[in-house]
């Protein structure tokens, strides 16, 4: 792993776009279609990851105080929401979510399907999506679409999504494609919809990983790119209780700038 200077806007390896994305695709073709494969040998952190993600996401959703998460949202009784958290401007009815960089569906199965009626999955590796159909079990019936496509090319259906969840995948996008992707995502949001990002962050600058053709950006750099994408961060939170040797992980909730 090479540390790129903060002044370097585009690491050299990212300048050949075709090779950059091709190398990443080749890397993931050789990764086992398992939770351990998706998490780089850290399958044991999955419950902790999901727990904090769920707590973060539920703060934005119209849900009863004690909901049966196995029951699709459309048949739950929704109580009027009330909150003193001024960072949450409105609650979202959890209808359809999009899981970006979905892999075999770990986040879809454990975070999104328990909260939403329907989930769409977008993942560049078709083999992972095929495995997802087994991994999800009966829950696969609530998958709206399986999109086998890289985020650099993906165009969400206009106005479809209550929430777009993007986790541990943005490092594969060049800065320009990062901005373009989030501009398209905004068109995919239903009225009042939300974009959530969960990513590793560096203390400063950009870390380059030539093995899997990815970068890890700083909080400052991510916010710079969010701003270029015309997104406003309305809430952020640091993931707790991960092993010390891992990157710091941060969650961001965003809405389009008004």
Set out the residue ranges of the language-model regions:
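Hydrophobic adenine-recognition pocket in adenosine-nucleotide-binding enzymes
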Residues: 169
